[in-house]
Amino acid sequence: MIKLIVGLGNPGAEYTATRHNAGFWLVDQLAREAGATLRDERRFHGFYAKARLFGEEVHLLEPQTYMNRSGQAVVALAHFFKILPTEILVAHDELDLPPGAAKLKLGSGSGGHNGLKDISAHLSSQQYWRLRIGIGHPRDLIPESARAGAKPDVANFVLKPPRKDEQDLIDAAIERALAVMPTAIKGETERAMMQLHRNGA
């Protein structure tokens, strides 16, 4: 069963529409669907809501610590409510998936994502669920003939808003991810994963 859903992003209006905040977008949508309001909760270092989703009580969290310190918020909430790593789902932007893709998986490394890296360090575990929301990679914007030796600026890319066509694809992927949330929250995470991946996400 999933008891805590964390959306990763950076705090502040200047980052709201940027690719790195895709995790926030998903949690914002979940809060809206539950009729819950995310409020600043200092003890959890983020915006927090306790929501009733699909018949289950679920904690929603958007760390306000900046991305590379997300673990501080996650571990504070997980310890307070005695939530195990395997009961946590972290939604985050994923450079290695194109816009329009979303994948669910348990465990493994951070893939260079500083938010995941910090969460794993604070939890002393990588065994939590990740919802990877594809944002594409800046190398994809470089013509193939010019890619050899090119060094795409990843930091600049994730801190910029997606193009309109990319945003539409990302929004569609988030909708597909939301459609499998009832299954995931009830603990049928493997089934949710199969549904999400089968639906072309």
UniProtKB/Swiss-Prot annotation:
Site (Stabilizes the basic form of H active site to accept a proton): 93
Cleavable signal peptide: none
Pfam families found in the cross-reference section: Pept_tRNA_hydro
Compartmental location: Cytoplasm
Main location: cytoplasm
Keyword annotations of the record: Cytoplasm, Hydrolase, RNA-binding, tRNA-binding
GO molecular function: peptidyl-tRNA hydrolase activity; tRNA binding
GO biological process, one term: protein quality control for misfolded or incompletely synthesized proteins
Marked site: Discriminates between blocked and unblocked aminoacyl-tRNA: 10
EC number: 3.1.1.29
GO CC term (a single one): cytoplasm
Homology family: Belongs to the PTH family.
UniProt-listed PANTHER family: PEPTIDYL-TRNA HYDROLASE
Subunit relationships: Monomer.
NCBIfam families linked: pth
Protein name (Swiss-Prot/TrEMBL): Peptidyl-tRNA hydrolase
Gene coding for it: pth
